[in-house]
Amino acid sequence: MWDLLVRGGRVVDPASGLDAVADVAVRDGRIAEVRPHERGAGLAAEDAAEVADAAGRLVTPGLVDLHTHVWHGATYWGLDPDPIAWRTGVTTWVDAGSAGAYSMDGLRRFAAELARVRVHALINVSALGLVAETGEHHNLDNLDVDTAVAVAARHGGFVRGVKARIDARTVGRHGLEPLRRAAALARRLDRPLMVHVGYGPPTIADIAPLLAEGDILTHCASGCPTDLVADGRLTAPARRALDAGAVFDLGHGSGALAFDVLEAELAEGVRPVASSDLHARSVHGPAFDLPTVMAKLVAAGAGLPEAIAAATVRPARALGLDAGTLAPGAAADIAVFDAEEGRFPVVDVHGSVRESPVRLTNTATYVDGRLLPPCAAEPPPPWIPLSGSQRRAEEDRVGATRSAVRRLESPEDFDEPFPRAGS
Ligand SMILES: [Zn+2]
């Protein structure tokens, strides 16, 4: 007997090499069996307590977003993941440096443990984390490696790596010293280092020599660094980082996706992780959510299965997470989408437009085999500027949420008696 059977969808699970019409059975919060239809009949509906018909839909592992900011109510960038997860299929959220040593305990207790989704963290090398818009490295007293090691040790597997924003504004006059300390911290924890790149200095040529195999270069398709891609080719330092085993991660955010850079990287053989860098300033656009970022990756030339790999198995492996697959025994984190085919315009942060041949609209999201309930987001905090169209979209969303509540008041609503307690 199964608790849930997701039947007849196109199941794409790159970790298992599966792309076929199949049934997915769940028992005790775990994937119990996945049976492709070509191997005979599907799984029997009678054997399941609940059956979800996914015919004509796309079924993937719950998506894994490698770069997000979920320390809401405590930082400049933070947002609550649950109001976004249920409508996007993202079941694993990696918070990228919102908390440093001083607030890791708070991120865990007041954001991660209260969320319905899975949350992991990268510890910021600055003990201040991302409480403010920038400047966390301006006072090096806050970048104490011993303190960060001690805090990370208390949090075991919750802390999956280290984060450092390395751009001119964030490092101030300290140049590469914040990066050196972040690298030292990552080596001592034996975990990957995620480096945010932007307007330098430091440049990619400065940063790349400090990256080790498995470290993550986030904002990899940003138009901001001047020496990431040149004349449609990876620059020598970017090529060196790639060849040394650095993971290239999109980290779309509010300013880090340029189609010309991404297209050059794909042509050069980069297979990036698709992450949203979702935060209070990117959730209303231009990133919106991870399925939108995946559609942009497809628009830039990657196939849909490749985009799914970039948002499931690849980010999971980058941090050694037990997520991103529908293999039997895995946690039953499942995303179901309407994968509409057509020509859908998508835009990068510089206003360049491409057409995606697919648009992903999430129709159901399960964590541990349980359907995430719809849930409305809080209004954006006062320091987040919204454009006129972003404000109107926000008002529409609030209005639609209110009008979703229907009273039972027409005569047909009373054609049978309401159930009474005890009857
Ligand atoms: Zn970020």
Residue spans for each PLM region:
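Divalent-metal coordination cores built from histidine and acidic residues
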Residues: 83-166
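Active-site metal-binding motif and surrounding structural segment of the metallo-beta-lactamase
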Residues: 39-60
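His/Asp/Glu-enriched, well-ordered alpha-helical/loop segment
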Residues: 260-340
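N-terminal metal-binding scaffold of metallo-dependent hydrolase/deaminase domains
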Residues: 1-44
